[in-house]
Regions:
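Positively charged n-region of N-terminal signal peptides that target proteins for export
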Residues: 1-4
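Short, helix-capping/interhelical loops that line the mouth of catalytic, cofactor-
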Residues: 19-33, 81-144, 164, 199-205
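Hydrophobic alpha-helical core bundles mediating ligand binding, dimerization, or RNAP-core interactions
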Residues: 42-45, 144, 148-151
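Short alpha-helical hairpin
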Residues: 48-55, 118-125, 157-165
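Short, contiguous alpha-helical
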Residues: 59-109, 149, 153-205
């Protein structure tokens, strides 16, 4: 009898844990919002890099500034890295109690406002600096599109995204907010590509 009692307790605890994670899942509205943001920022990247010549891809406004090709490579590599961090580090951290709704709202909005803001300059970490790892701008662009599709598929199926939290330069973010960060990061660098294209010396063709 004692053995069956212990088993019952384990089952109850497991179900309670599952219910807790479910309670901390994102709403369908928030999930749709993030998917729409991932799609719109992907479109922004593709629009900014559409029909560029080799000269346009590789133009650098100054020796220390990145070309559109280098930004594209950075975006493709960062998509992989940020999603991997979300899946392998954030989501594998211990579940935490549900945060206050107002705190979540403020944190979500902070990601959407701060990450795309180009007035705050951030040095790219060494693993994400351009090295021509994809071989060509077109290959980097293709990799970005494929990686973004993987990110979207992950968001569609993942559960408990609000239950797992990790530190970031903006404070503690949950896994859902790390997905928002992925999209916001591509918005930030789309602005960077448009800055390069707006340079008066940018090749006409």
């Amino acid at each position: 009898m004692k053995r069956f009692g212990t088993a019952a307790v384990i089952v109850v605890l497991a179900l309670a844990g599952a219910a807790s994670a479910k309670a901390q899942d994102v709403s369908q509205a928030d999930r749709d919002r993030a998917l729409q943001y991932l799609e719109s920022t992907k479109k922004g990247v593709l629009d900014a890099t559409k029909s560029l010549s080799d000269a346009q891809w590789n133009f650098k406004p100054a020796p220390e500034r990145w070309s559109v090709a280098e930004v594209m490579e950075h975006l493709a590599a960062a998509e992989d890295m940020l999603r991997g961090m979300t899946q392998e580090q954030v989501m594998k951290s211990p579940a935490v109690p549900m945060r206050d709704a107002e705190e979540i709202k403020k944190s979500d909005e902070g990601v959407l406002a701060m990450v795309p803001d180009r007035s705050h300059k951030i040095q790219a970490p060494e693993p994400l600096k351009p090295t021509n790892r994809f071989g060509s701008p077109a290959a980097a662009q293709k990799h970005f599109v494929e990686s973004r599709a993987t990110t979207e598929d992950y968001l569609k199926g993942a559960t408990g995204l609000r239950a797992h939290v990790a530190d970031s330069p903006m404070g503690k973010l949950d896994a859902y907010e790390f997905v928002l960060l992925i999209a916001a990061h591509s918005e930030r660098h789309t602005k960077q590509m448009l800055e390069v294209k707006a340079d008066p010396n940018f090749p006409k063709s």
